[in-house]
Every structure is written in C-alpha cells, then in structure tokens.
C-alpha cells in the first residue's frame, strides 16, 4: 500500500512539472495541453515503460535453453523469495550492471549485462540478482520505471521551452528568461524526485536481497567489484539515456559534477557497511 501511495505521489509531482512547463510554453492553454499529455504519459508509463526501457538497452530475453546457469539461478532465487518467475534478459554490454523492471511481481523482468556475468563469481552474481528480486518483492519496479521514462519526457519538454519559446496567458511571447529557467530547473526537479524515491529503496533492496540469498557478504563484495569496473567501463545505453541510471544496482554514469552531486544511489561504502553489519559474527 505504501508503494502504491509513492507511485501516486510520483505521478502527481511529474504531472505538476508538465503543467508548469506547459504554462511557460503556452500560458493557460499550454498548461491544459500539458495536463492531457501528462495523463497520457502516466497511462503509457504504467503499461509500457518496462518494454520501453528494455528496448533502450537492446535487452534480449533468455530462457533455460539459451542461458541455463543464469536462468536457473534466477528461478531458484525467485522461488526462495516466493515470487512468480520473472522474464530474464541479457544486455550485451561490457560494463557490469543489472536492473529490474515491470508493473508488478506478476509482470516483472530482471536484466543483467554480459559484463556482470563475466566479472562476478557465482556467489556474487546470486547476491546481485537477489537484490533485483528484492526490488520486485518490494514493488519498487513500477516506481523506478515510471520515473525513468517520465524524467526523459520532462527533459524533452524543457528543451522545447528553451528552443521554441512559447506564449504567456495574454498571447504574447513568453519571457525567454523563464524558458531558460524551465530548461535548467525542470530536469533538476525530475532528478530530485528520482533521488527522493531511489536512495532509500536501494538500502531496502540490499537488505532484502541479502535475506533472499542468505549471503550479505557476497552482495557487499559484488557492489565493490561493480564500482571498480564501472569507473573504467561506461554503460553505453545509460550514457545515452541517463534518466534510466537510477534503475541500476550501481550508478552507471561516468563523470562528476551535477551527475555526482545528484546521484540516485547511496555511497557504495555506506551500502557495504550496512551489508557487512548483517554478517553473523563468529564467536
């Protein structure tokens, strides 16, 4: 129920952003049009955003015959988590990363890069996939997928506000300074919304994944290894679609600046410390 409320709040916040941009573009008429567009986008995001994200990453579905070891691992973990078997995808990227998407546990998918299968041990990979299934179990996947697709749409509308100007409520050309401010602040607002819902759920998914796999130390080791590789190997699809970065188990975006300041992921050191605190102490 709580995650359903978070989804409703997310949709309402993004709808308000759409209307603000519409007001800059075309006054009251623009605001009304933006409301209609936002409602349509909310509907589209609910039903199709998972397919859209998987297509962005050119993810290929696999099964027990094409990827028996990986598919079997996901099936075993899903059974332990008492979840329906999700669809399983592989992404042909060297950068190690993974994510989950879908409307609900009955319509979920998990995806991993070929790079993560190469660099992690089987034990570490189990920890990562258990983390993704924890997102499914906690019903985070709808929130993250909707916020990714809607953030991209907001950035696009903000660029329209800058390059095509607009008209105020009196029919005169809109203030170009307002257009510039919208272009700068709307994507920032979308990022802040993503941050608000993303950081806390990563900690929860770490904890839940450790409980599913029964091995918090393996997930901690995986996070450290993914971070080391991520610093030198860019995830090309995420660089093209940065709004999807918050879906990943580790922030895949290169560079610092605003991207680092407004990261949707908690510090890896903090995540590792929380996981290691779950490891039973030997007497």
From Swiss-Prot:
It is found in: Cell inner membrane. Keywords: Cell inner membrane, Cell membrane, Hydrolase, Membrane, Metal-binding, Metalloprotease, Protease, Transmembrane, Transmembrane helix, Zinc. GO terms for molecular function: metalloendopeptidase activity; zinc ion binding. The active site is at residue 132. The chain crosses the membrane at residues 7-27, 29-49, 146-166, 177-197. Belongs to the peptidase M48B family. This is Protease HtpX homolog. Its cofactor is Zn(2+). GO terms for biological process: proteolysis. InterPro entries: HtpX_protease, Pept_M48_protease_HtpX, Peptidase_M48. It holds the Pfam family Peptidase_M48. Binds 1 zinc ion per subunit. The lineage of its organism: Bacteria, Pseudomonadati, Pseudomonadota, Betaproteobacteria, Burkholderiales. It comes from the Bacteria. Its EC number is 3.4.24.-. Its main location: membrane. HAMAP family: Pept_M48_protease_HtpX. It is an enzyme of class 3 (hydrolase). It is a multi-pass membrane protein. Zn(2+) binds at residues 131, 135, 202. The keyword Cell division does not apply. GO terms for cellular component: plasma membrane.
